[in-house]
Amino acid sequence: MNQDNCRIKVNLKNNPYEVVVGSEILYTIGEELLRINIRTGEKILIVTNPDVSKPYSRRFITSLKEAGYDANLLILEAGENKKNYESIALIHNAAYEHQLDRGSLIIALGGGVIGDMAGFAAATWLRGIDFVQVPTTLLAMVDASVGGKTGVNHPKGKNLIGAFHQPKLVLIDINTLKTLPQREFRSGMAEIIKYGVIKDLELFNKLENEEDLSNIYSIKECVLLELIKISVSIKARIVEKDEKESGLRAILNYGHTFGHVIETLCGYGHWLHGEAVSMGMVLIGQLALRKNLWNVDDALRQEKLLTKAGLPISWPKINNEDVLRTLKGDKKVDKGNIRLIVPLGIGMVEILNDVSENEIKSLLESI
């Protein structure tokens, strides 16, 4: 590895692991598995999608086989509209066909949807087998691949079916971003901006100082590496303190409660996850203004930075009653109370557990 690559430890009590971040490290997967003591000869099922499989899977499998593993490939259609029971059944069928046992491994090679599905399939096959995350989208690199959340969507709500199942390893090669559509890249940038708002003023300032955040080719590789490392480190430290989201980890949901409403009501896939989160962040920013929790300047800074990243900031045209009904079914609702993460300033948020339905209704009517 060159000096720009790094290993970020996620120090969980029962399931510690490393996130390896670097450039041109995708095909070190075989040696990385040997390093974490995955025995040679074990069966490995790689779950990926067509856009990722075409440029990467052949050499990826070669790396595994050269390390002594029995590797097989399953190609699934990705996208939020495919994140369902049917796709999980396809993974389980492949696990049965290739005779995966409790010593076997599932590798997610792809974006957040592939990672969520492969992780959930691993969590539920034989009551749980190991899996590895190899994210190929910016959003998956800085968010979905770290922390052990896995699952699928339900027609009534996003990610309502799932499990906490920590990976054995996360391998991030930023070179895979070069084949990523620009819209997907911008979607991932929303999560990096989120980290700045919830926890890191310095990161937010750094993002503001970049001329263009909407195009991967306008950001220097060293800068992109640093942004990913900072984001992963922030999430790792939060997950270490609250693995199962009983308290602090909830701040990672900033913008997500309303973002998930958008994804559910507009149809999975109509808006990308980061786009929906961006609109959710702006709406929560407006709520914070109404409650005098932060100032207009910070709200405008957030909106300006999201716009610079090419992200939408205007709430879509959806029925307010549908929004309220969907909110009540969100997994972050506790005993009927709507729990929201609201900003106090750039780099600071707090959890509000008692936001009333009338407050939400008034907010929606004002935009």
UniProtKB/Swiss-Prot annotation:
The entry's keywords:
Amino-acid biosynthesis, Aromatic amino acid biosynthesis, Cobalt, Cytoplasm, Lyase, Metal-binding, NAD, Nucleotide-binding, Zinc
Q: Which InterPro entries match?
A: Dehydroquinate_synthase, DHQ_synth_AroB, DHQ_synth_fam, DHQS/DOIS_N, DHQS_C
Listed as disulfide-bonded, the cysteine pairs are none
Q: What is its EC number?
A: 4.2.3.4
Q: Does the keyword Membrane apply?
A: no
Cofactor remark:
Binds 1 divalent metal cation per subunit. Can use either Co(2+) or Zn(2+).
**Gene Ontology molecular function: any one:** metal ion binding
Q: What class of enzyme is it?
A: lyase
Compartments it resides in: Cytoplasm
The keyword Transport belongs to this UniProt entry's keyword annotation: no
Biological process terms in GO annotation: amino acid biosynthetic process; aromatic amino acid family biosynthetic process; chorismate biosynthetic process
Residues binding NAD(+), per UniProt: G112, V113, I114, G115, D116, T136, T137, K149, K158, T176, L177, K178, T179
* Pathway annotation from the record: Metabolic intermediate biosynthesis; chorismate biosynthesis; chorismate from D-erythrose 4-phosphate and phosphoenolpyruvate: step 2/7
Task: Enumerate the SUPFAM superfamilies for this protein.
Answer: Dehydroquinate synthase-like
Q: Name one Pfam family in it.
A: DHQS_C
Q: Name the cofactor(s).
A: NAD(+); Co(2+); Zn(2+)
Q: Where does Zn(2+) bind?
A: E191, H256, H273
What GO cellular component entries does it have?
A: cytoplasm
Which family would the database say this protein is a member of?
Belongs to the sugar phosphate cyclases superfamily. Dehydroquinate synthase family.
PANTHER family linked to this entry = 3-DEHYDROQUINATE SYNTHASE, 3-DEHYDROQUINATE SYNTHASE, CHLOROPLASTIC
Q: What does this protein do?
A: Catalyzes the conversion of 3-deoxy-D-arabino-heptulosonate 7-phosphate (DAHP) to dehydroquinate (DHQ).
Full protein name:
3-dehydroquinate synthase
Q: Which gene encodes it?
A: aroB
